[in-house]
Each structure stands twice: as structure tokens, then as C-alpha cells.
């Protein structure tokens, strides 16, 4: 066979013309730092494993000790959680640089103070599996149970379920099992590209955000790796400079992999600090979490063939459509739980399904839905704290460009309306001019409370339908 027919690998990818990433603020490159938090989840007979750990430590070429504890190896890993993590935490928080943590669930459970610090810093915590072990020969049903248990422990310890998954020491089944779990916005067990890409999974499209084994401090613990911090810095700088130069035409992402027990050592940490400062000295750089990258890609780069809601996992569906109804993702969740079909793969069909889901809400939920909406040309608009959708909608009707007299009139009508009904005036402004909106205020102020509640809910459905039409593909 000379072609790709029937060949299960994609050797072509984006080819000679990759998509234009469109990172925020015209960034040439997205530089993303990952801290792997594995200490306390590694192979150890205390954890029910057959032997001691032998991977990624100061003891290059170490071998497992069957049935025995390896005290030197244990203390090397302990350095990562006791000292190395906190050095990295200070380094990134002092510079206000976002981080994604690949956190092993059992390691998280053994150092909740570190997890609290991750949350306090606003870092993304993705799951790094249940245990930091080699899954190569693990039966798929066992690995699936481990993934499920990792999500359970992670959610309990971190306070929220992980939306990213990186097993690391993976099996041939890992990626499929991650896609089957259904709750991950991205999987990262790939090193195949400089950009995210879509795979068609067993439950619909799955975003892959490739990771790195080259721009990674693990090479301090590998043959022919980095022997000094200067080598690490030079490699990271060359990687950044190349991608920054390319990025004016074809922006990419640069992942940097870190380990608390490796680069957390003082002699290596200095080189990392120099590199972070070097990146910060450039203007057109975006420094996101991996979840930020995934969400950006989902918004701007749908999978081939566009979005088919009936083929989306609940997590991806809510990510895409959870903001269709203002601050009310429960409507998207209810619509997905009710079951989606080919009929809902159009904007009109999905709008009907989501309106039906909203109608199923309790009176309290509907009241909260109405209250979730901002005043038109109100204080939130002036403070520029509206949602992206509301900002665009109000701008389309010219409500961001009011004269002082117009602003005073809108303010008076907003106040009068709230005083009468106890909730904000809601109208699908994309359908209307400023004059239409002002006339609507005057007309609806005469309604009774029940009629106006029904009118507000109908307008909310109309707003949602218009938003759905604006979603690409």
C-alpha cells in the first residue's frame, strides 16, 4: 500500500497552509506553561504497585525495585511536592503568568495545600490520570476505571471536574478512552502538531491540544538531554524565536513542560525564570492556559463539516451553547439531556429545542433567567462588563454610542421599568433601532406583571435564536 487508504495514522495534518490561529491581540505565538504535579502518585509499593518508581528523576537509568521501597527515589519525588512546587508557584504568581497543572489525582489528594494554592492562583488544573504509572499493558476496562476514578477524586479535591486530560504514560487505548469519557474539552496525549486539531471520536468531535516532549524539563533526566540550565534556556529561546518569527503569517503555540522535582531545583529554576522574563519582554505574545487555548480554538475553528449538536458531548455542547441564554447554562444542559436529533442540527431546530428546555424550568429558574439580563445601555454596559454576546448586540443597535440626552432617557426608562416589574427590560435589540427600543419601553410599561413576564421570556427566546444563527458553522 502506497497511499493513505485504510491507514489509521494522519501523516498530512494541516499541510502547507495551516489555519490562521487568530490568537487574542494579534499574538504571534501562544506560550503555554504546564506544571506536571505527579509527586505522591508515582510507582510505590505503598500505593499498591509492584515496584518502586524508576522514571524522570536525578537517578538517570534507575531500575524498578520489585517489592521494595526505594528511599532515594522517594525523597527525590518528595522534594518536588515539598520545595519544588512552591518555588515554581512563586515564580509564576510573582509574574502573573497563567499555568496549566497536569495533576495526578492521587498526588492531589496527598497535598491539598498545593491544590488550594493552584486554585488561589487561578491556574487550570487538568487531570494527569489516577496514578503516575505506565499504562502500556493495562487492560482497557481497568484504564477506563482509573480515568473515572481520577475525575472523581480530582473533582472532590479541586472543587471542579477537570476539562483537560493528559495521561502521559499512555496506552494504545488512552486517547479513545479519554474521548469516551465525554467530559473533556480537550485531550493532550499527542505531540503531532504546533496547533490544536480535531479528531472524530466515538461520541463526536474531540479537540486535541498537542503537548511537548522536547520543550520539556524531562530532558534533564534523560540521556542526551539538558546538562545545564543554559542548555534548557537556549532550547526554549530558540523555539520561541522561531515561532515568533513565523507567527506574523502563521501563529502557533509553544508548550513548555515542567516538573516540580526537576526544574524546581534551584540550579534549573534560574534558567526557567530567565526564559519567562524573555517571553514577557515581547509584545505580541499570548500566555494562556491550555483550557484558554481550547476555548479559543472551539470558538474560531469548528471541526470539518461544522457543528452538529446531535453529535456533541454534553460538555462540548454546553461550552458552545451554554451562553446562548444569558448566564443560564442549565438550559443547554436540559436540552442536551432531553436528547438531540438531526432536527436540532440547524439553528432553527436547536432554537426550538432550547426554548422548550427553558420552558421546562421552574418559576424560580425563569425568574433568575430574566434577572440575569443587563439593563439596555445601563451601568454594566458603561463599565464594559457585559457578556461578549450582550456587548455585540447592544452595539448593533447603537446603544454604545448614545448622546447624553439619549443616555439620560434610557436611564430613566430603565429605572421606571425596574420599579414597576422588579426585573430589567428585555428586548432582542438586533431586531430593532433605538427608536423601536424606546417605543417598546413606553408601550410595555403599561403591561401587567404576568403579561410582561411572558413577554420578557419570549424576547429571551428570540435573543437566543439570533445568537444561535451567529455561531460559525
Q: Where is each model-derived feature located?
A:
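C-terminal amphipathic alpha-helical segment
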Residues: 221-232
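Charged, compositionally biased N-terminal leader segments and the immediate start
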Residues: 306-326
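Catalytic alpha-helical scaffold of carbohydrate-active enzymes acting on polysaccharides/glycoconjugates
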Residues: 2-207, 233-256, 262-305
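C-terminal non-catalytic interaction appendages of large macromolecular assemblies
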Residues: 402, 406-473
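A non-catalytic, amphipathic alpha-helix used as a structural packing/dimerization or gating element
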Residues: 87, 145, 149, 235-238, ...
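A structural motif
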Residues: 202-219
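Residue-level signal for inorganic ion chemistry
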Residues: 328-329, 425
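Aromatic-anchored, charged helix-turn/loop surface patch used as a conserved interaction hotspot
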Residues: 323, 329, 333-413, 463-472
Amino acid at each position: 500500500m502506497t497511499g493513505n487508504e485504510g491507514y489509521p495514522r494522519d501523516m498530512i495534518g494541516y499541510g502547507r497552509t495551516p489555519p490562521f490561529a487568530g490568537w487574542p491581540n494579534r499574538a504571534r505565538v501562544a506560550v503555554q506553561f504546564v506544571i506536571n504535579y505527579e509527586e505522591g502518585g508515582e510507582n510505590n509499593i505503598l500505593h499498591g504497585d509492584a515496584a518502586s518508581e524508576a522514571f524522570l528523576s536525578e537517578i538517570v537509568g534507575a531500575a524498578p525495585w520489585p517489592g521494595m521501597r526505594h528511599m532515594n527515589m522517594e525523597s527525590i519525588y518528595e522534594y518536588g511536592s515539598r520545595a519544588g512546587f512552591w518555588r515554581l508557584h512563586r515564580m509564576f504568581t510573582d509574574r502573573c503568568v497563567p499555568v496549566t497543572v497536569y495533576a495526578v489525582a492521587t498526588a492531589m489528594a496527598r497535598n491539598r495545600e498545593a491544590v488550594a494554592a493552584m486554585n488561589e492562583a487561578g491556574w487550570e488544573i487538568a487531570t494527569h490520570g489516577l496514578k503516575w504509572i505506565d499504562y502500556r499493558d493495562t487492560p482497557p476496562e481497568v484504564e477506563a476505571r482509573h480515568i473515572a476514578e481520577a475525575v472523581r477524586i480530582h473533582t472532590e479535591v479541586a472543587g471542579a471536574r477537570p476539562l483537560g486530560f493528559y495521561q502521559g504514560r499512555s496506552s494504545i487505548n488512552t486517547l479513545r478512552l479519554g474521548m469516551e469519557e465525554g467530559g473533556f474539552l480537550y485531550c493532550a496525549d499527542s505531540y503531532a502538531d504546533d496547533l490544536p486539531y480535531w479528531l472524530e471520536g466515538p461520541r463526536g468531535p474531540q479537540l486535541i491540544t498537542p503537548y511537548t516532549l522536547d520543550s520539556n524539563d524531562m530532558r534533564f533526566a534523560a540521556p542526551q538531554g539538558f546538562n545545564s540550565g543554559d542548555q534548557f534556556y537556549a532550547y526554549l529561546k530558540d523555539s520561541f524565536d522561531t515561532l515568533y518569527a513565523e507567527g506574523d503569517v502563521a501563529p502557533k503555540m509553544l508548550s513548555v513542560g515542567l516538573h516540580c522535582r526537576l526544574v524546581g531545583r534551584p540550579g534549573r529554576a534560574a534558567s526557567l525564570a530567565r526564559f519567562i522574563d524573555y517571553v514577557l519582554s515581547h509584545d505580541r505574545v499570548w500566555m494562556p492556559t491550555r483550557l484558554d487555548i481550547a476555548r479559543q480554538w472551539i470558538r474560531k475553528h469548528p471541526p470539518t463539516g461544522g457543528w452538529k449538536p446531535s453529535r456533541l458531548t454534553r460538555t462540548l455542547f454546553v461550552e458552545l451553547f451554554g451562553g446562548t441564554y444569558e448566564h443560564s447554562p442549565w438550559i443547554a444542559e436540559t436540552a442536551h439531556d432531553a436528547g438531540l436529533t438531526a432536527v436540532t442540527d440547524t439553528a432553527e431546530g436547536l432554537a426550538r429545542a432550547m426554548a422548550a428546555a427553558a420552558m421546562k424550568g421552574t418559576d424560580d429558574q425563569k425568574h433568575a433567567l430574566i434577572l440575569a439580563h443587563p439593563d439596555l445601555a445601563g451601568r454594566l454596559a458603561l463599565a464594559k462588563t457585559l457578556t461578549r454576546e450582550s456587548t455585540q448586540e447592544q452595539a448593533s443597535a447603537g446603544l454604545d454610542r448614545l448622546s447624553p440626552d439619549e443616555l439620560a432617557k434610557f436611564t430613566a426608562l430603565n429605572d421606571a421599568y425596574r420599579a414597576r416589574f422588579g426585573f430589567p427590560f428585555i428586548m432582542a435589540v438586533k431586531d430593532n433601532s433605538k427608536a423601536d427600543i424606546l417605543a417598546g419601553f413606553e408601550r410595555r410599561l403599561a403591561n401587567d406583571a404576568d403579561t410582561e413576564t411572558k413577554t420578557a421570556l419570549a424576547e429571551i427566546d428570540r435573543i437566543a435564536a439570533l445568537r444561535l444563527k451567529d455561531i460559525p458553522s
